[in-house]
Amino acid sequence: PRRQRQMCIRDRYGADLNAMLAAITDKTRLVFIANPNNPTGTRVSDRQLIDFLAAVPKHVWVVLDEAYLEYVEDEDHLNGVSVLAEFPNLIVTRTFSKIYGLAAVRFGYSVSSLTFADLLNRARQPFNVNSLAMAAVMAALEDDDYVAQSVDLNRAGMVQMTEGLTGLGYEYIPSAGNFVAFDCGEPGNDLFQRMLQEGVIVRAIAEYGLPNHVRVSIGLPAENERFLGVLAKIGANAAASSEMKAPGS
């Protein structure tokens, strides 16, 4: 029977490639890495990734999810497609749901060796992409200005969000994506419910081994401000409630 094994994230919330490599056996057929990672936003270094790919047995496919690649500010960040010729067992996946803003069309793609592409082509649905989605994607690929504006907006929003979180006393995980995860000091699901009551949606990420963290997407300046304002309000209410319940109060 086919089985999957989830690996714990290492210190500072990134992927432990050495642990992943050590976990590979003769029965392993596929390894999955998101770079930048979701939901923490961390990324592995180019050297770490190259060394990992070189060490993975050739019978193991390595799926490198680069959904958030365009948000990475480091110009020298490794583009997985650039090393496909060197590592034929590498499969790079991308999406138009993030930087291009086309989540509704559900359009993604992979770049791989002809061997894997042939296998994937045999298994795919006959009408897996519609013509409207393809037209939208072709238009998006020609709109470089929109992508550049999205990157600039995300950069400014990330500064606004992280400075706001720091000002409120929350520790966040430095992110290379379009979101940031932070330690809310309580079960993330509890904060999720309180934020929801205020009309703000965040994502609890306990299922990723981070029970006290939530992830919030970077939005427009007014949206970021709205989130930070609600978070401050919830924190103030919690502090007041705690003081009222303190012994001798």
Where are these predicted regions, by residue range?
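Conserved PLP-binding catalytic core of the aspartate aminotransferase-like
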Residues: N154-R155, E163-E198, V214
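PLP-dependent enzyme catalytic core of the Aspartate aminotransferase-like
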Residues: R47, R194-E198, R203, E207-S249
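Short, small-residue-biased leader/transition segments that mark boundaries at the very start
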Residues: R2-I9
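PLP-dependent aminotransferase class I/II
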Residues: N89-I173
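Short acidic/glycine-enriched loop/turn segments that link adjacent beta-strands
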Residues: A104, A176, G209-N212
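Active-site pre-lysine segment of PLP-dependent enzymes
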Residues: G14-D26, P39-V62, E66-I99
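Short beta-strands and strand-loop turn motifs
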Residues: Q6, L30-P36, V62-E66, I173-S175
